[in-house]
Swiss-Prot record:
EC number: 7.2.2.10
Entry GO CC: endoplasmic reticulum; endoplasmic reticulum membrane; endoplasmic reticulum-Golgi intermediate compartment; H zone; I band; membrane; perinuclear region of cytoplasm; sarcoplasmic reticulum
The gene coding this protein: ATP2A1
Nucleotide-binding is among the record's keywords: yes
UniProt-listed GO biological process terms: calcium ion import into sarcoplasmic reticulum; calcium ion transmembrane transport; calcium ion transport; intracellular calcium ion homeostasis; negative regulation of striated muscle contraction; positive regulation of fast-twitch skeletal muscle fiber contraction; regulation of striated muscle contraction
Gene source species: Gallus gallus (Chicken)
Region annotation Interaction with PLN: where it falls in the sequence: 788-808, 932-943
CDD domains, alphabetized: P-type_ATPase_SERCA (cd02083)
Protein name: Sarcoplasmic/endoplasmic reticulum calcium ATPase 1
Phylogenetic lineage: Eukaryota, Metazoa, Chordata, Craniata, Vertebrata
Length: 994
């Protein structure tokens, strides 16, 4: 049923053709079940394991590697002699890498538990209904409820469907609907229609929403929506419709993979075509097919060389290390790629309650009447320090510390706060903090009494548990609470009836203490308390009091004010009819006004500094809250989102004002605004969508079920540690301490991680460029193989992988939070950097080929060939006069290959040092600024020595031992790469950046 909240109870009953006292007939239930289905949320269709596995192989680079492995495997079958084992190593290793990558990918996907499944926990098991087949109320499975059912709910129940209240069977009906609307206090419900068809859920005071909890009272209503048609069901549908976009890094790597695969394919084909003339060379036994297969193997080697196989593992390791560092700062990252996304966050949309504020109501101001002379009235105003539930803080008057017990008015004010109160403080020893037991507003009053300590109770020797309610206990020993007149909407107040606890104090007599909304309470006051006496409340005095309350409620602070009053001579207890709540207002008359307290949910201490940091870092902070606009703007001013006297028109909107704008203006509003008040969850999703249309990278905080769709839609969904399971499972990050400052620390960490990732991605890519150049040169010049695929795999995975991982530990730049967020469209490798890595890669390739050629041409233990002989080695036979005196087996020697591999590994280690900083010289940033890098270089070189000198590894890798003379040549060829990169950095620093 649409807009049930705007209809009368009678209209709702007529719509479903049902009688409140009888309920639906069996036939009506059957028809409704056919029409609306069962009252449950459909389960999410998950992907099968097979679908997840196939997904892992959709990446182009992975497919090229898979093809290379299959081809190598087929070619290995046709190998002869002792090379058979070596031939099988390569496809086996490639397959192992692919399987490991797929396992990690599938495991990560399976681990991201489904937020839609978590919604199920809000579905109650049972419901209570009236139906025509039974005279009394009956319990049925909640899934069998249908629209039109007459349902009953009572304190402690979970609401089983969306229900329009028909009648309330208790004084009040309080509902905790925080999971759905984010309201921090329970809401009082009524039965009258809400005439606004566009009312937000917070304003639908005659509706009960599925999954929310009844805090107090009992009611009967008619079910108006079940299953996916409930408010919680709409959230489920919105989440199911939200597609998860790829993170900026994933998009970059995908683009890079596509470009790389095209380049690889071109080079492989080129190498094969260049050598068509060599297919018939004698070395292939004159067989054109064997020659074609030989060069096909070289093309496969090229593919293996060009793909940085170690990259996925290094990225995962770097992100995992980043998540550990973030966890230490209370930011628990649930999805690894989002660590990097945090680095480009340009807008943070933050909830107010609990994130920017403490979510611990505290009284910060109060006043009592000092003097009344005729129509002139002067007030004593006090301020109170301390912004949490901890009973620590001072009472100040004109910025000076005072003892509250010296003011009679404050003693009575503290008495009312302690007795007219059903809440208390509790010290949580596990967390080491004070927490509320009961309503936030009342707990603030309990805390105020502790700070005031009007009877000078000695609290120094008490434990924290005893300290929680020490001063309240003293007051409660003086007066005994007989009964409570519950809060009701019509009078907007509550009261307690108290009698003196001891016979000695009988002279005081019984009292009624009242607290409530100032207008309602003051209207029922006839007197004002001045010291220990009372004087009549004249219109002028009343006006003065209300003026101060209005100023407190609308000024910079927008405090929530409560008036406190006493009825000095209440009726006798036996004369009061407590069963009839309509009489309560009558008993709360002839009151004496005692004072007023102003409270607020105070901003967290560290938030102002964090917002300043965001501004310096070019990040816009938008506050989104369910509170009213005045309060929202006041908090924005207090924490620095708006300055004290900044004009906020066009920069702050309520949900209703936002809805009234045409779509183009809504989009523009999202570009300018920094504050949205009185919003619904759908607004949050809309705001995220509009921000994304400006290419903003948005972080969105939330804690309720209602926030889940927006959390899922934003690039970075941030759930509160104290939030619901649904919010947590829909988010990328959870704040263990619910603190806004933690988000800013996480953004800083994300920026540092991205900078380091850029360094190691570039390091690995320049290494691969070197390997490609090496193989291309050997094929193009007709030289013997310098490197084979199994060696390339070893270098890509192990030797390069360790320093690349260590580059993830580079210290962050000092000015990292002084720069604007990087654009998600910024390329991973710019034109200049591409040139740099081509230059470095070109040197790496040429040096590797040069090392192998050096042994053939110039080494003392080498064959001392001519350049012509080396480049035409395929024509070497005993009958060829050009190769007279040359043993053709020399071209199979492992020494030149070992030289080439050793030069490649040593150059890569030098290159890792170059990658400490993008443009800083090694003289400014010496290697020991990242001790992990120094350690990983030592480990990589040690592993290289292992495959050279520990049998049987040299046989598997087709290598041999090198002597000192060889190593000196390796170092001479490798070291210049540092000088080359220093020259390129110098150009970048002095000519490009300038």
């Amino acid at each position: 049923m649409e807009n049930a909240h705007a209809k009368t109870a009678e209209e709702c009953l007529a719509f479903f053709g049902v009688n409140e006292s009888v309920g639906l007939s069996g036939e009506q239930v059957r028809r409704a079940l056919e029409k609306y289905g069962h009252n449950e949320l459909p389960a999410e269709e998950g992907k099968t394991i097979w679908e997840l596995v196939v997904e892992q192989f959709e990446d182009l680079l992975v497919r090229i590697l898979l093809l290379a492995a299959c081809i190598s495997f087929v070619l290995a079958w046709f190998e002869e002699g002792e090379e058979t084992i070596t031939a099988f190593v390569e496809p086996f290793v490639i397959l192992l890498i692919l399987i490991a990558n797929a396992v990690v990918g599938v495991w990560q996907e399976r681990n991201a538990e489904n937020a839609i499944e978590a919604l199920k926990e809000y579905e109650p098991e049972m419901g209570k209904v009236y139906r025509a087949d039974r005279k009394a109320v009956q319990r049925i499975k909640a899934r069998d409820l249908v629209p039109g059912d007459i349902a009953e709910v009572a304190v402690g129940d979970k609401v089983p469907a969306d229900i329009r209240i028909i009648s309330i069977k208790s004084t009040t009906l309080r509902v905790d609907q925080s999971i759905l609307t984010g309201e921090s206090v329970s809401v009082i419900k009524h039965t009258e229609p809400v005439p606004d068809p566009r009312a937000v859920n917070q304003d639908k005071k005659n509706m009960l929403f599925s999954g929310t909890n009844i805090g107090a009272g009992k009611a009967v209503g008619i079910v108006v929506a079940t299953g996916v048609n409930t408010e919680i069901g709409k959230i489920r549908d919105e989440m199911a419709a939200t597609e998860q976009d790829k993170t900026p890094l994933q998009q970059k790597l995908d683009e890079f993979g596509e470009q790389l695969s095209k380049v690889i394919s071109l080079i492989c084909v080129a190498v094969w075509l260049i050598n068509i003339g060599h297919f018939n060379d004698p070395v292939h036994g004159g067989s054109w097919i064997r020659g074609a297969i030989y060069y096909f193997k070289i093309a496969v080697a090229l593919a293996v060389a060009a793909i940085p196989e170690g990259l996925p593992a290094v990225i995962t390791t770097c992100l995992a290390l980043g998540t550990r560092r973030m966890a230490k700062k209370n930011a628990i990252v649930r999805s690894l790629p989002s660590v990097e996304t945090l680095g480009c966050t340009s807008v943070i949309c933050s909830d107010k309650t609990g994130t920017l504020t403490t979510n611990q109501m505290s009284v910060c101001k109060m006043f009592i009447v000092d003097k009344v002379e005729g129509d002139v009235c002067s007030l004593n105003e006090f301020s109170i320090t301390g912004s949490t539930y901890a009973p620590e803080g001072d009472v100040l008057k004109n910025e000076k510390h005072i003892k509250a017990g010296q003011h009679d008015g404050l003693v009575e004010l503290a008495t009312i706060c302690a007795l007219c109160n059903d809440s208390s403080l509790d010290y949580n020893e596990a967390k080491g903090i004070y927490e509320k037991v009961g309503e936030a507003t009342e707990t603030a009053l309990t805390c105020l009494v502790e700070k005031m300590n009007v009877f000078n109770t000695d609290v120094r020797s008490l434990s924290k548990v005893e300290r929680a309610n020490a001063c309240n206990s003293v007051i409660k020993q003086l007066m005994k609470k007989e009964f409570t007149l519950e809060f009701s909407r019509d009078r907007k107040s509550m009261s307690v009836y108290c009698s003196p606890a001891k016979a000695s104090r009988a002279a005081v007599g019984n009292k009624m203490f009242v607290k409530g909304a100032p207008e309602g309470v003051i209207d029922r006051c006839n007197y004002v308390r001045v010291g220990t006496t009372r004087v009549p409340l004249t219109p002028a005095v009343k006006e003065k009091i209300l003026a101060v309350i209005k100023e407190w409620g609308t000024g910079r602070d927008t405090l929530r004010c409560l008036a406190l009053a006493t009825r000095d001579t209440p009726p006798k207890m036996e004369d009061m009819m407590l069963v009839d709540s309509t009489k309560f207002a009558e008993y709360e008359t002839d009151l004496t006004f005692v004072g007023c307290v102003g409270m607020l949910d105070p901003p967290r201490k560290e938030v102002m500094g964090s917002i300043r940091l965001c501004r310096d870092a070019g990040i816009r902070v938008i506050m989104i809250t369910g509170d009213n606009k005045g309060t929202a703007i006041a908090i924005c001013r207090r924490i620095g989102i708006f300055t004290e006297d900044e004009e906020v028109s066009g920069r702050a909107y309520t949900g209703r004002e936002f809805d009234d704008l045409p779509p183009a203006e809504q989009r523009e509003a999202c570009r300018r605004a920094c504050c949205f008040a009185r919003v619904e969850p759908t607004h949050k999703s809309k705001i995220v969508e509009f921000l994304q249309s400006f290419d903003e990278i948005t972080a969105m905080t939330g804690d309720g079920v209602n926030d889940a769709p927006a959390l899922k839609k934003a690039e970075i969904g941030i759930a509160m540690g104290s939030g619901t399971a649904v919010a947590k499972t829909a988010s990328e990050m959870v704040l263990a301490d619910d603190n806004f400052s933690t988000i800013v620390a996480a953004v800083e960490e994300g920026r540092a991680i991205y900078n380091n990732m850029k360094q190691f991605i570039r390091y690995l890519i320049s290494s691969n460029v070197g390997e490609v150049v090496c193989i291309f040169l050997t094929a193009a010049l007709g030289l013997p193989e310098a490197l084979i695929p199994v060696q390339l795999l070893w270098v890509n995975l192990v030797t390069d992988g360790l320093p690349a991982t260590a580059l993830g530990f580079n210290p962050p730049d000092l000015d990292i939070m002084d720069k604007p967020p990087r654009s998600p469209k910024e390329p991973l490798i710019s034109g200049w950097l591409f040139f740099r890595y081509l230059a470095i890669g070109g040197y790496v390739g040429a040096a590797t080929v040069g090392a192998a050629a050096w042994w053939f041409l110039y080494a003392e233990d080498g064959p001392s060939l001519t350049y012509h002989q080396l480049t035409h080695f395929m024509q070497c036979t005993h009958h060829n006069a050009e190769f007279e005196g040359v043993d053709c087996d020399i071209f199979e020697s492992p020494v030149p290959m070992t030289m080439a591999l050793s030069v490649l590994v040593t150059i890569e280690m030098c290159n890792a040092l170059n990658s400490l900083s993008e443009n800083q010289s090694l003289l400014r940033m010496p290697p020991w600024v990242n001790i992990w890098l120094v350690g990983s270089i030592c480990l990589s070189m040690s592993l290289h020595f292992v495959i050279l000198y520990v049998d049987p590894l040299p046989m598997i890798f087709k290598l041999t031992h090198l002597d000192l003379a060889h190593w000196l040549v390796v170092l001479r060829i490798s070291f210049p790469v540092i000088l080359l990169d220093e020259a390129l950095k110098f150009v970048a620093r002095n000519y490009l950046e300038a």
